[in-house]
Amino acid sequence: MAFYYQKLFVKLILKGFKKVYFLLKIKFDTIQHLNKLKKSNSYFHTFLNKESLAVGVLFLRPGEKDTQEPHESDEIYYILNGNGFLHINKKSYPVKKDQIYFVARNIPHHFYGNTKNLSALYFFGGSDS
């Protein structure tokens, strides 16, 4: 069973420009979540949904349509496997394993053109609403 650990160092600038650092550790089993997703009728699953952070997995089969709408929060995609393109605000970017993409809030975007199964982790800078 493969576990991915995401360690995020968060830096806060408080009043008076004092710096505070803390470590946020999230443990999740992406294989388990992807296997559940493959058996469902959906192509994405949010497994952590907090007020300030949402994390989930996206899985698209070759040719499957990505119908997502712009989100109210900034989003980061980490490509786990596959290929294709990510269309962000009228520009397309080729995607491949281990690449990271940032999409600002309220910006139209979608994946397309994958000839292999495409799986990605996504992180919202807020809840997945």
PLM region spans:
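Conserved short histidine dyad/triad with adjacent acidic residue
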Residues: 56-71
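Ligand-binding loop in jelly-roll beta-barrel domains
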Residues: 105-129
